[in-house]
Amino acid sequence: MASSSPDSPCSCDCFVSVPPASAIPAVIFAKNSDRPRDEVQEVVFVPAGTHTPGSRLQCTYIEVEQVSKTHAVILSRPSWLWGAEMGANEHGVCIGNEAVWTKEPVGEGEALLGMDLLRLALERSSSAQEALHVITGLLEHYGQGGNCLEDAAPFSYHSTFLLADRTEAWVLETAGRLWAAQRIQEGARNISNQLSIGTDISAQHPELRTHAQAKGWWDGQGAFDFAQIFSLTQQPVRMEAAKARFQAGRELLRQRQGGITAEVMMGILRDKESGICMDSGGFRTTASMVSVLPQDPTQPCVHFLTATPDPSRSVFKPFIFGMGVAQAPQVLSPTFGAQDPVRTLPRFQTQVDRRHTLYRGHQAALGLMERDQDRGQQLQQKQQDLEQEGLEATQGLLAGEWAPPLWELGSLFQAFVKRESQAYA
């Protein structure tokens, strides 16, 4: 039986800034992925592709019908599954997803994970609004469900999404196959493991209101407040913690309204006092991402990814789509083929070592920081210097002060990953 207990530790935080909240004419997206503390997150580049009509695509648990063309994507994902916690595509669409529990029960059986829906939307969409339509269409056709952790004990949930592109953002919140969405055309917004769309609904499932009325959750007369109507009546402690993180994140965004930059977002993701940078028992922030999506379509989008846990002791490394982009091998986990615990039935009966090269080096670096204060500080300074170099280079690029060859842009992430790996050697 699928567990849908919101008491189970699981948390994430997503943020977006749309001008005039941003300091520059760009939409800025950010996310912390909070997962089991030993789960490895890899960064995977998937090139654009063409596919045979009628072919099938294997996602984490089920197959779906493939489309004829897919876009290039960069994904930050738990290395055991097909989908992703967060990512971007070549058209400047970014998506992050989070766990949520509502009055709608979590369905039994395997379907699409919210993380599968995220990747499918990135591969098939050229705008945030189109990505929303892709997710809701797949949700209606295939549903969502299946174990969301690499563990024999079942643990399932529904999903919320923050979707952004160069011009706007959308919040999409689901309850089973039902959903509500809110469009953000200016200002800053965040989501944190709870329903947050109230009466300001920009789009919705056609049966959302009739379903709520049939269940006795809404009388059909008063204001239709999605979060109030579909949230659990008795909020457990875990959800109260999510509410506190949501409020803290909203306040951090409010304090920097009009001046939000990539660095500001990185600072928010590193905020430990609020719990946004999480390290609690068996869970922690396992990977982080910040994206700068310029409104000028002639400028490249820049995506910063850590590929390592704890953003306060990690390096945000720049990735830009373009010529010369290839997989950085140091952030790719080993594969186990048909013997992978996610592929064999019953699933997750054994464990495998999914640590990639950068993860191993970073793991050793964290140990050094805790054992030897002086050497640890030196190593952390190297991290900060490398990150600052990436920030300054990309700022120069967007300001027109740096015009490298296209192949150099495409290999930027690989170069920074290599240098970080060498720093840990």
UniProtKB/Swiss-Prot annotation:
The active site is at residue 12. One of its GO terms (biological process) is proteolysis. The keyword Phosphoprotein applies. The modification Phosphothreonine is found at residue 52. InterPro entries: Peptidase_C69. Keywords: Phosphoprotein. The keyword Phosphoprotein applies. One of its GO terms (cellular component) is extracellular exosome. GO terms for molecular function: cysteine-type exopeptidase activity; dipeptidase activity. Belongs to the peptidase C69 family. Secernin subfamily. This is Secernin-2. It comes from Homo sapiens. The gene is SCRN2.
